[in-house]
Amino acid sequence: MENSKWIIFLQCFIQLGFGQTNSEKVPLTEIITSIENKFDVKFSYAHEDVVNISIEKPDANFNLQQTLNHLNSKTLLNFKTLDNRYITVSVIDKMMTVCGTVISAENNAPLFGASIYINNTNKGVISDDEGKFQLEHVPLKSFITISYLGFKSQQISVESLFNEGGICETITLEENQETLNQVLITKFLTTGLQKLIDGSTVLNTEKFGILPGLTEPDILQSIQALPGVESVNESIANINVRGGTNDQNLILWDNIKMYHSGHFFGLISAYNPNLTNKVVVTKNGTSSEFSDGVSSTINMSTKDVLTHKLEGGVGVNLISADAFLEIPITKKLALHLSGRRSFTDFFASPTYDNYFERSFQDSELTTNSDNISESNRSSEFFFYDYTAKLLFDLNENHKFRANIIGISNNLDYKENYTNNDNQTDSKTSNLSQENIGLGTNWNAVWSDTFTTDFMAFYSKYNVDAIDYRVETDQKLTQSNEVLETGVKMNSKLKFNSHLNLLNGYQFSEIGILNATTVSAPSYDRIKKDVLLNHAVFSELEFNNTQTYVRFGVRANYFQKFSKVLMEPRLNFRQKLSNQFALKLQGEFKNQSATQIVDFQDDFLGVENRRWILANEKNSSDPNDRNIPISESKQGSFGFEFNQNNLVLDVEAFFKRVEGITASNQGFYNNFQYKNATGSYEVKGVEFLVNKTANTYSTWLSYTYSVNDYKFESFTPSKFPNNIDIRHSVSLAFNYNLLDNLEVSLGGIWRSGQPFTKPVSGNETIQDGSQTVVNYDTPNSNNLDDFMRLDASVNYNFDISDAVTGSLRAGVLNVFDKENTINRYYEVNPNNPESAIQIDNKSLGLTPNISLRVRF
């Protein structure tokens, strides 16, 4: 018995001794030499890479591959076999698995849904309900960014997270004291889309995943994935939010009000996504800080953090090429630049051909005189945009920013013809469209509880057309110009961690010019209007773990009309349990600038809308129509269910907009040239179900709405809205086949748009000396349902430790479904007693491909 005790003691001692021996670290150079002798191999390495490294010896029973795996796990070096004898040792192309736990600095609570991304890539994950995450195949020399809305982001080097024991680090995020509007859903529909607690949606372009059919994170195309947001004619220059027209959307770029949104006259977003870091879309319950946009607010913000190393990227697709740079100048000063230009004026891709055909339907480019053959017509189109932002941090408490943005579309249309002297001559018509914006911002932190913001902006929009009409030897010149300047001052007082008070003042001056000149007969008309607006606003924002309330009011004073408009705002969300919440939103809003269509062939028939300013019957010109200030009242109520990355969102809404004009709606019936004011009323329900995980995301959205006009002077006075889309369904599925390979497939189905038929058997009538179409009851018929299936694929790859690339391919309308998006009628030139039907078609099968490199 005594001997047994000594034997057990001796075994424990021997095991302890061996354990201590194995845990002792020895120089890596010695280990390499012993491996070379044992396995008859040769290591190739730089002496300085290994000389200062000491690790535990590998197990003596390991084979060669197990031994190399041990070295790889214990060092930051990459041991790689070239053949049966030679092994390379380097610090290049080392891939790691990174793990960690994200917690709040305030209470050490885990942060569920934090975003963890490898910088300059689309690769990332979200933390689980314990705040834990794991990222595989991460380059050693890369950086990861950990972010969570409502908290300050952290950027961490992958190398700093390495440890021999494979222990996951704890990463602490500090609360961002500037906002109580916390994130509600971290991965909404796709990577980079998030939903805030106030119901607004945030699009983070740098982290944005793919959507069906898109090869770029097109800002205004992407937001159409949201329920209640769509374009009835496939144009981002005509985004309809809850039944509203495009001019009823307030579009801001770094606090600069923009009046133009699309390249290719509506098919491509005019806002370069590479430096546009965040886009917030609000449909209701808007902060009292914002006015205009009686349908929605689309607020874009560029990157606002100083970079300490040069970063940038270049990209190309079948339409355009672009580049961007983030340039550190000093520790306190940086410059961000971006630019994009199409090459459509010297290369016509299949994508360009489809876009061209879609954009210029019914324009003079496709419907001009039959006396001029197609061989005698030519056109040249190109677009470009650029942005620049200067960032200066005086210190941690005072930050200054200056911005510039420029957007341009240019179209030349040339016609060759035979003149009266029987000589060949040519005329070139031109259309140019530009929006230039300048802005500045000063953010000041005066204490832990008080901050201020001062903003000023200048925005100029103009569309100019020179139209040579060969048949009548007439030159028509048209111009529409908008010039707006504004200043805004905000102050935010933080009472405690749950309650904020926002106060502010805003001043804006807007001038709009419309000019028309005709050469034969000679005619000139120039009209310019100016309107000054003063506004004060205030709102309280409260948020705790159960209740979120934002209540505010905005008072607008229009100096020209001596008119005051009060705008209350409400945004309320009550959490009933960990899964269920109720929400209630409401707002009054107004806008003084709207778009109208005078004639369908204005501006070559390509961009026939022009901006005008409200006059409130305050014009001395008897030819001026009455243009009131548009005013909206909106309310919505709904509930949310959110559990295990499954989101169910149902919301009923009601919206009434008064002060619209007939010319503002673009009628194709008897009301086309009528001067009248009226309103529209839309009510409906939005439904969304969204399931996400680290490898996939799928969603189904459905909107039912009824949208009716009311014009007292028309007969009938009440009839369906031009964009009365009763049913709209969107379905999509994203899946990560591999860590660096993602596919997306989705479809759209919606009811056909209303249109007006001529009276059967009496299709035309005389109106004075003219024969016109005799339309039946307005908007009493509907086009066939719209259906489209889109697909995309994205492949990410590493060119080096510091350079990454992505290759994307996408197809719009995979099955080449022919959809009619508009229908109207004209008098038949060969038989004036009948009318001919004209259909505008949607995009056919349209492929695109893009290649992007970031460094």
Label each region the model flagged.
Residues K399-T452, K460-L483, D524-K527:
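Flexible loop and strand-edge segments within Gram-negative outer membrane beta-barrel domains
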Residues N543, A652-R656, N675-S760:
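Gram-negative outer-membrane beta-barrel transporters
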Residues T344-F346, P350, F356, W749-Q766, ...:
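C-terminal beta-signal and adjacent terminal beta-strands/loops
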Residues T121-K132:
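Short, acidic Ser/Thr/Gly-rich low-complexity loop/linker segments typical of extracellular
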Residues I32-F39, T75, L82-N119, F143, ...:
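Short, acidic, small-residue-rich periplasmic hinge/interaction motif at the N-terminus
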